[in-house]
Amino acid sequence: MRRRRKTVVVAVVIRRVLIWAICVMTLLCFLTVHIYVAPFNRLPKLHLNHHNTRRGYIIDYNKSITEQSLTRNLSRPESNEIPLISNPKTNEIQYQSSISEHINNTELVPPHVSTSPSSSSKLNITSGIPDFDKLWKHPPNRNFVPCVSPNPSYTSPLESRGYLLVHTNGGLNQMRAGICDMVAIARIINATLVVPELDKRSFWQDTSKFSDVFDEDHFINALSKDIRVIKKLPKGIDGLTKVVKHFKSYSGLSYYQNEIASMWDEYKVIRAAKSDSRLANNNLPPDIQKLRCRACYEALRFSTKIRSMGELLVDRMRSYGLYIALHLRFEKEMLAFSGCNHGLSASEAAELRRIRKNTAYWKVKDIDGRVQRLKGYCPLTPKEVGILLTALGYSSDTPVYIAAGEIYGGESRLADLRSRFSMLMSKEKLATREELKTFMNHSTQMAALDYIVSIESDVFIPSYSGNMARAVEGHRRFLGHRKTISPDRKAIVRLVDRIGRGAEKDNRKVYERINEIHKTRQGSPRRRKGPASGTKGLERHRSEESFYENPLPDCLCQRDPSKAR
């Protein structure tokens, strides 16, 4: 009997031990699963309000908007002051909805884009979580917001003394800046501005009219309290005296009030032969500077067809996730003008020399491309851009929108860049030929599409500081200092050359150096730079930072500096 009892007791003990062991193992398995899943709960919180604001603003930024609405819609929401790494308990649902926000439009990709983005490329926001802030977060805006309303003493336009005709010159963004300057000049000299004529004779030979590129009626109405604008000269004024005048570059208030305004005593129609850089960047009355910003960021909006197509391109880029807009300035005319030929064949370099020699209005003919490059005066090559993006830490599946005309050398010239970044997109890849049909053969309209996609990008990087790069950077500053990385071309080419010569065996050191250099070149708020020391005359003005590259302090005010972040 005693043996049976002992046997029963032992059996009971063993059973309890087994049950306890099973419970412990179950608990360990449960904990192991959660240890694996937990990192997903710590994914960075994507502020949907921020992206929704920007997606909606593709439409809004081209509307005539009040200073109050600019403050509300264009500055970062207060919620954006919450750290990107937020409470793990609440982040899982927000993360899932954030992902759907970025990938639910994949059906918008046109049929000829043969492969849809892989799941890894769509979810690029989750790769390298600790680096999310470094790669995508905008710099602190320090509570700077647009402030473009005129002072209380600002009056309606005075009685017009005559008509100002304008022949713009250059590409899209050079013409845009010139038009905005002419609006301000018309105010200074009490002129009625006739809707400007776009450049049809320069390198691009674009036949677009003002109304093809811009919303003409909106332009006229938006400026009605500043100047009088008409579509064309009235009939029956053939007898009026006319004059063609080359306004002096970078001229100030006194030049226009005295020398130009005095011409009304003799002439009733003044035609400005050129529009580029005719007004000084600095030392103008605050109301004139604010008028330039109202003209640029409110009145001069793109035509309906361009805005609609631009919105579509942005939506299609957003379907791939967060994206970089890369202004890759490597077109034939750019290389010919600048004399830059690094990485080109002998025949290609010779072709560019012929173009430069045969283009009459390009004054400098003999250019040493090697010297230009080492001084940082050349656009980065596609290969150099690829090294830059890699050094900054962007993964190979990062969507990159190429904002450019026809790349010199075609697709083969992009091989080095594509070997590092496979998701290279462009308007030609995002849209069908039928969708782009009305814009083709019109370089100004195609550039306007690139402008919209660049403004709305998560990160903007120009390979060269030309007119578009400056215009986009200034607009992004105006919209809340969106992340804009300005490459130090001089430093980059020297570091890249070290790799090419084999002088640097460890590429990581080069990458670290490039990364370090660009930590302070990401579009943070700062005052516009003045002239370079030691410069005089026209060269002094040219060395200044362009007004439209950085409209601070004239058109951006700090709201409650004590709360700046």
From Swiss-Prot:
Which family is it part of?
Belongs to the glycosyltransferase GT106 family.
Where do Basic residues bias regions lie? 520-530
User: Subcellular localization, per the record?
Assistant: Membrane
Q: Which Pfam families match?
A: O-FucT (PF10250)
Keywords in UniProt for this one?
Carbohydrate metabolism, Fucose metabolism, Glycoprotein, Glycosyltransferase, Membrane, Signal-anchor, Transferase, Transmembrane, Transmembrane helix
Detail the disulphide connectivity of this chain as listed in its UniProt entry: none
At which residues is glycosylation annotated? 62, 73, 104, 124, 190, 441
Q: What organism is the protein native to?
A: Arabidopsis thaliana
Superkingdom classification of source: Eukaryota
Q: What is this protein called?
A: O-fucosyltransferase 7
Q: Where does substrate bind?
A: 327-329
Chief subcellular site?
Answer: membrane
Could you list the residue ranges that cross the membrane?
A: 17-37
Q: Tell me yes or no: is Metal-binding among this UniProt entry's keywords.
A: no
Q: What is its EC number?
A: 2.4.1.-
